[in-house]
Every structure is written in C-alpha cells, then in structure tokens.
C-alpha cells in the first residue's frame, strides 16, 4: 500500500497502562523484511500496578499475522488479562474505520477511542466495503453492544 507507512500496514504497536489508568505508547526498534521484528527495551515504567505492568498490543491494520513470538526476561511472568464483560462499542465502516493511513496500529481512530473510553471496541471497518448492506445490519443487530458507530 504505497499511501501508508509499513508500520501501519504490517507493524504492531505496544501501549502500557499505569496504576492511574493512563496509557503510554512504548517506542521500539523495528525491522521490516521477510519477517517483521520489533524490539522493546526497558519496559519498566513508574506508577505500575501492584502485579506489574499491563500492556496492550495492537496488531497490523492490513496484513495478517501468521506467527507471533513474545519474549520476556528470565524470571518474568506473562499473563493474559481476562476479557472484559462490558458491552463493546461496535464500529462499522470503510477503510478509515479499518485504520487506513494511520502511521501505526495504535493510531487508528478506533484504537484511540478504545483507549480513551477504556472499554472494548469491535472494529468492523472494511476497505472498500462499507456499503450499508441490509444483510450486514441484520448481523450487527445480533451483537449486544453498548453503542453502534456507523461510519460510511
């Protein structure tokens, strides 16, 4: 996609949350080739939770992930956060909702919204296909959402 940076199309984005609920972007060194590699150094931050750091990893906006490896320092714990029981915000739209032209996955407006609201977001943005199809709206009606956002 010549109009988007490789970090948006194929990259990942990592954010951490402090004990006050404030989220911060974690800068990384990255390499793009046959394999995309991100290296994060010194991911210790002030004001952490009692149990350590909490991170959110945003996956590529356009390219799929066939394999993902996450390494942690020896002696560290790695646990997944339990899925939220809160009803999600469901977003239906076109390429802009999908994340087109965002510089990084975390900068797609849907992911910014998720961080600002601190609630789950289901992103149903499809490049070239946000056509307000009746059948799709019937499927949307089956989702128990806190709110629907239609961006077409």
Where are these regions (language model features)?
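N-terminal secretory targeting modules
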Residues: 1-88
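Serine-esterase "nucleophile elbow" of acetyl-processing enzymes
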Residues: 48, 55, 59-142
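Short acidic/histidine-rich motifs immediately flanking catalytic phosphotransfer sites
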Residues: 143-147
């Amino acid at each position: 996609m010549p109009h988007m940076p490789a970090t948006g199309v194929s990259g990942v984005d990592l954010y951490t949350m402090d004990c006050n609920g404030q989220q911060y972007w974690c800068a990384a060194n990255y390499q793009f080739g046959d394999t995309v590699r991100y290296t994060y150094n010194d991911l210790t931050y002030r004001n952490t939770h009692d149990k350590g750091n909490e991170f959110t990893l945003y996956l590529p906006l356009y390219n799929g992930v066939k394999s993902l490896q996450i390494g942690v320092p020896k002696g560290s714990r790695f646990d997944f956060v339990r899925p939220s029981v809160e009803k999600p915000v469901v977003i239906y739209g076109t390429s802009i909702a999908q994340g087109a032209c965002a510089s990084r996955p975390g900068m797609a407006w849907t992911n910014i919204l998720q961080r600002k609201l601190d609630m789950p977001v289901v992103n149903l943005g499809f490049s070239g296909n946000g056509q307000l199809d009746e059948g799709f709206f019937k499927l949307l009606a089956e989702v128990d959402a806190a709110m629907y956002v239609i961006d077409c």
